[in-house]
Regions:
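Claisen-condensing/thiolase-fold acyl-transfer catalytic domains that form or cleave C-C bonds
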Residues: 1-109
C-alpha cells in the first residue's frame, strides 16, 4: 500500500486520470473517492503532493516530486506524514513515454 503520493500535475485532469489508472479507484467511483479530506496532509488516507506540487515548487518536470517522495521516507519533509514506508511518484498520463517510481524504506523491503 502507498503511504503518500506525489503526482505530476501540469493539468488537474491528469492527476485524476493517473490515480484511476493506477488502481486507487475505479472510474465509476471517482465522485466518492476524490474528496479533499482523502488527499490532505497529514491526516488523509492518501496524502497527495505534500510539497505543494507544481503550484508551490516542482514544475521542473517532476524532479521535485521525487525529492519529496524520498524526504517523506527519511522523515525530512516540511509537511511530514507519519510512518511513511512506501512513497509513490506518478509522472503521467497524457504524454508518452512516462515513468513512475515507488520508493521504499528498508522496513518495506
Amino acid at each position: 500500500d502507498i503511504d503518500v503520493l506525489q503526482s505530476y500535475e501540469n493539468f488537474t485532469g491528469g492527476v485524476l486520470m493517473s490515480i484511476v489508472e493506477h488502481g486507487f479507484c475505479k472510474p465509476e467511483e471517482c465522485n466518492e473517492f476524490f474528496t479533499n479530506d482523502r488527499f490532505r496532509a497529514p491526516d488523509g488516507d492518501l496524502p497527495l503532493n505534500t510539497s505543494g506540487g507544481n503550484l508551490a515548487e516542482c514544475y521542473m518536470h517532476g524532479l521535485g516530486l521525487n525529492i519529496e517522495a524520498v524526504r517523506q521516507l527519511w522523515g525530512e519533509s516540511s509537511n511530514q506524514i507519519d510512518n511513511v514506508n512506501v512513497s509513490m511518484v506518478i509522472s503521467g498520463p497524457m504524454v508518452t513515454p512516462v515513468s513512475n517510481s515507488i520508493f521504499c524504506s528498508e522496513e518495506a523491503l
